[in-house]
Amino acid sequence: MEENIINLIDENGVESQFEIILTLEAEGKEYAILMPLDDEEAEEALIFRIDEDEEGEILIPLESDEEYETVVAVYTAIMEEEGLNYDEDESNGLN
């Protein structure tokens, strides 16, 4: 399995595959932008904070709208720096 492909299990025990399309740092914390691989029609990526526990790295859902907005702002800056299109009305496809 490729290093940037991970499996996540939701609260219902359903396992899904995601590709880590980008990791970034915002306000001293690290975040992962994930795109679902199981749903080929999916247009929205998911954002998780990367944290660590005794077993290694874990992904934590964002806890607030403020944290989400901070990560989206950093993501937007990275995309603009890379010369990629940004459509504020579509929130960059991030969820």
Swiss-Prot record:
Coiled-coil parts of chain: none
Domain of life where this protein originates: Bacteria
Xref: InterPro entries: UPF0473
Family to which the UniProt record says this protein belongs: Belongs to the UPF0473 family.
HAMAP family from the UniProt entry: UPF0473
Protein name: UPF0473 protein CD630_12860
Organism: Clostridioides difficile (strain 630)
Highest classification ranks of the organism: Bacteria, Bacillati, Bacillota, Clostridia, Peptostreptococcales
